[in-house]
């Protein structure tokens, strides 16, 4: 590919030099100061003995009169009488070959030929370069669009093993079974079993689908063929199907083997959707895949493994038994899984003694394996930036904040008055988190701007919650209202800010779901009303139910929010003095943890109902827990 580009560049350079040389020669040979003259006039001047000197270049005559005037004209080919006349009249005549246009002239025939053929050679070079790009090979593959782009691993395998995959023990068992079958198929066939023809890994981005496939390739003792779904999509009709056939032809030659198709939704999207483009190349590719997986021309020994983030859009024919027999969901890791993943990624990183990976695992609920690896990498970069020899706990905590909330904006210009209001807002959230007995334990409060947030209150639950009772939900609403209520208690109704916008949105949504989704309202009763919000092109919200029912739901939601607001405001007003001390400390240090927060409250005689809690080691805990983080972010 680089050679073809170099050839094209040299074509352009040579062509430019030829054209420049030709123009320079013509410019040098031309006489811009000569006066054009007709041949008849020149003949008359010769007869009148007015010409003293003449220079003949091919078919052009440049004559100099005796009074110093320079004139030029052209003579027809073969007309030589004027030359004889000038010699007869004593004119000094010089003759030289033409500088261009005469192919027979010495040295100019090559230049003329190159000028004539240069456009043809230029277009030929561009065409060859395009063919090499699309064919992805040498000159013999200029038109080989249908060749597969799959990578075949026979001797060289990815250096990833199942031991490098953590946080998905059940999935690893399924994969280990496939490896066992490839190693000893007779043991399974003895019982009449057959291997699955296809395995589909699906889950959210970053959970480890491709990593698991790499581990399978590293463990299996059979050839591994890897290809992306987008490799089958091309601008030419039929190329995708041809590449699909070529991929499976390669697989048959290397059977038994494994074919891994990453991002299969690129070609496996459900058929029948509206296609404004006429012929759908993707559908042809999908049809060919269906035939290859379970058609008349199938062969034994080929295992298809695919990965996707969108199983809901795949064609039903692709998911039926006989094609993808097993569909394995890869979830986000729980707290134990996150702990195991952190240990795997921390093996090659020097950690200080104060690093607690268990606490990091609890502080990162909802994080995928890719997110956790990114956190450890960010922590390593932060430690290197500070010229440390080890990664400390503070580096990991800062890395979590960077990933979750964005970079610190310490240079952001915030007036002392605004900073105080932000501190009051966040202190109100934190106080309600400590005063609600059913709330999740407080972790820390910060007023350092990060991303779009001006402050954040973080809670780290210690128990896994799969269901929530009404008390849990009401506690969440009280905590969300804490920021706005603190502003009103400290500054009055006219002093409230726009910082509670996100809090009110979340509280309203939660209250609506309490009433209309989970049926927890005594007045409305046990009923569930679906509400569809369509933001596309300004779409409106569509809610089921009669107008009277919807009106009753709205009244109950308003009542629930008003009650929570008044109760929250009462609690904050009763502890205003203690909260003022917290605000001063928060303005001074910008970040305080739960322990320091409680110590300040205890100095004012305030007893919290939800103290800071610690959990025993995950190594000793029998049941896995899944903490969830609750962030209250002030967006102004």
Swiss-Prot record:
Q: Which CDD domains match?
A: RecA-like_FtsH (cd19501)
Q: Does the keyword ATP-binding apply?
A: yes
Which metal ions or organic cofactors does this protein require, according to UniProt? Answer: Zn(2+)
Q: Which residues bind Zn(2+)?
A: 425, 429, 503
Q: SUPFAM superfamilies of this UniProt entry?
A: FtsH protease domain-like (SSF140990), P-loop containing nucleoside triphosphate hydrolases (SSF52540)
Listed under GO cellular component are:
plasma membrane
- Which GO-annotated molecular functions does the record name? ATP binding; ATP hydrolysis activity; ATP-dependent peptidase activity; metalloendopeptidase activity; zinc ion binding
Q: How does it assemble?
A: Homohexamer.
- This chain's protein is named ATP-dependent zinc metalloprotease FtsH
UniProt organism field: Hydrogenobaculum sp. (strain Y04AAS1)
């Amino acid at each position: 590919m680089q050679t073809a580009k170099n050839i094209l560049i040299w074509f352009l350079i040579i062509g430019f030099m030829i054209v420049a040389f030709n123009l320079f020669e013509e410019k040098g040979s031309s006489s811009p100061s000569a006066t054009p003259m007709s041949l008849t006039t020149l003949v008359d001047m010769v007869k009148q003995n007015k010409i003293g000197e003449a220079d003949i270049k091919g078919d052009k005559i440049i004559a100099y009169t005796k009074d110093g005037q320079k004139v030029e004209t052209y003579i027809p080919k073969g007309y030589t009488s004027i030359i004889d006349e000038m010699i007869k009249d004593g004119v000094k005549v010089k003759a030289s070959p033409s500088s261009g246009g005469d192919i027979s002239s010495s040295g100019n025939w090559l230049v003329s030929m190159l000028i004539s053929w240069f456009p043809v050679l230029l277009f030929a070079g561009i065409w060859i370069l395009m063919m090499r790009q699309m064919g992805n090979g040498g000159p013999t593959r200029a038109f080989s669009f249908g060749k597969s782009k799959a990578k075949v691993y026979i001797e060289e395998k990815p250096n990833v093993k199942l031991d490098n995959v953590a946080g998905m023990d059940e999935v690893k068992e399924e994969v280990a079974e496939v490896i066992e079958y490839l190693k000893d198929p007779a043991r399974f066939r003895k019982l009449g079993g057959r291997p699955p023809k296809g395995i589909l890994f699906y889950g959210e981005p970053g959970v480890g689908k491709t990593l698991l496939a790499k581990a399978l390739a590293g463990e299996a003792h059979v050839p591994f063929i890897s290809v992306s779904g987008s490799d089958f999509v091309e601008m030419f009709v039929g190329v995708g199907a041809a590449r699909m056939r070529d991929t499976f032809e390669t697989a048959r030659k290397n059977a038994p083997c494994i074919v891994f198709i990453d991002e299969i939704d690129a070609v496996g999207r459900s058929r029948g959707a509206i296609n404004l483009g006429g012929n759908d190349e993707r559908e042809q590719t999908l049809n060919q895949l269906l035939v290859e997986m379970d058609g008349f021309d199938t062969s034994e020994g080929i295992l298809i493994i695919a990965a996707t983030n969108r199983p809901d859009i795949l064609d039903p024919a692709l998911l039926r038994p006989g094609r993808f027999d097993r569909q394995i969901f890869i979830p986000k890791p729980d707290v134990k899984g996150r702990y195991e993943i952190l240990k795997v990624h921390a093996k090659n990183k020097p950690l200080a003694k104060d690093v607690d990976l268990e606490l990091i695992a609890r502080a990162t609920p909802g994080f995928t394996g890719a997110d956790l690896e990114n956190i450890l990498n960010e922590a390593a970069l932060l430690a290197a930036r500070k010229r440390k020899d080890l990664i400390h706990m503070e580096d990991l905590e800062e890395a979590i904040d960077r990933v979750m909330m964005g970079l610190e904006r310490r240079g952001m210009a915030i007036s002392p008055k605004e900073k105080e209001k932000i501190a009051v807002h966040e202190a109100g959230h934190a106080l309600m988190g400590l005063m609600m007995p059913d709330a999740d334990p407080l972790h820390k409060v910060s007023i350092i701007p990060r991303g779009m947030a001006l402050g954040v209150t973080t809670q780290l639950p210690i128990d896994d919650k799969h269901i929530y009772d009404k008390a849990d939900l009401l506690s969440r609403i009280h905590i969300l209202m804490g920021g706005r209520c603190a502003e009103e208690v400290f500054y009055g109704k006219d002093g409230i800010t726009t910082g509670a916008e996100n809090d009110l949105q979340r509280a309203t949504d939660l209250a609506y779901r309490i009433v209309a989704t989970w049926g927890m309202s005594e007045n409305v009763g046990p009923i569930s009303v679906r509400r569809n919000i369509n933001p596309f092109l300004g779409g409106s919200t569509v809610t089921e139910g009669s107008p009277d029912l919807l009106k009753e739901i709205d009244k109950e939601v308003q009542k629930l929010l008003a009650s929570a607001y008044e109760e929250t405001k009462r609690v904050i007003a009763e502890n205003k003095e203690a909260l003022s001390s917290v605000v001063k400390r928060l303005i001074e240090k910008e970040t305080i943890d739960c322990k320091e927060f409680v110590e300040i409250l205890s100095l004012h005689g305030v007893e919290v109902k939800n103290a800071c809690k610690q959990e025993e080691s995950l190594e000793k805990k029998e049941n896995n827990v899944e903490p969830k983080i609750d962030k209250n972010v002030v967006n102004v």
